[in-house]
């Protein structure tokens, strides 16, 4: 190759799947909210988090940040032809309801809402109480 020429890298373009029905997994913790939209098998179509959208610190854990994350993920998933979703919510955070409402407002039909928060049968010792 001649000096100064770069080798052209061929990158495969991501193909658009045509999925009508999928699942939305909302993980809402005390610090952040993550929304992942998958097809019915579990392959990820799109995802977004409050931190990834530029919310930092205590603003990441707000319902508005979760709403924006759900909206962003829904718009990206609807490019794959998604029309209806089942929603699985995990965690104790404040953005749970806001994210579900945002998915509905984006134009997705919610067929099921299920809480899949893991509950220990006296497993690990919880963190110590905060003293403020």
UniProtKB/Swiss-Prot annotation:
The keyword Cell membrane does not apply. The keyword RNA-binding applies. GO terms for molecular function: rRNA binding; structural constituent of ribosome. Pfam families: Ribosomal_S11 (PF00411). One of its GO terms (cellular component) is ribosome. Keywords: Ribonucleoprotein, Ribosomal protein, RNA-binding, rRNA-binding. GO terms for biological process: translation. Transmembrane segments: none annotated. InterPro entries: Ribosomal_uS11, Ribosomal_uS11_bac-type, Ribosomal_uS11_CS, Ribosomal_uS11_sf. Part of the 30S ribosomal subunit. Interacts with proteins S7 and S18. Binds to IF-3. NCBIfam families: PRK05309.1, uS11_bact. Belongs to the universal ribosomal protein uS11 family. PANTHER family: 40S RIBOSOMAL PROTEIN S14/30S RIBOSOMAL PROTEIN S11. Located on the platform of the 30S subunit, it bridges several disparate RNA helices of the 16S rRNA. Forms part of the Shine-Dalgarno cleft in the 70S ribosome. This is Small ribosomal subunit protein uS11. The gene is rpsK.
């Amino acid at each position: 190759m001649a000096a100064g020429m770069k080798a052209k890298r061929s990158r495969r373009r991501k193909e658009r799947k045509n999925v009508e029905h999928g699942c939305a997994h909302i993980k809402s913790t005390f610090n952040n909210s993550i929304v992942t939209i998958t097809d019915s098998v579990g392959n990820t179509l799109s995802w977004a988090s409050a931190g990834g959208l530029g919310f930092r610190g205590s603003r990441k854990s707000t319902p508005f940040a979760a709403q924006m994350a759900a909206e962003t993920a829904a718009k990206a998933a609807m490019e794959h032809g998604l029309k209806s979703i089942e929603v699985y919510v995990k965690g104790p955070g404040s953005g749970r309801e806001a994210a579900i409402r945002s998915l509905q407002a984006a134009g997705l039909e919610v067929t099921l809402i299920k809480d899949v928060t893991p509950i220990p049968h006296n497993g690990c010792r919880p963190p110590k109480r905060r003293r403020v």
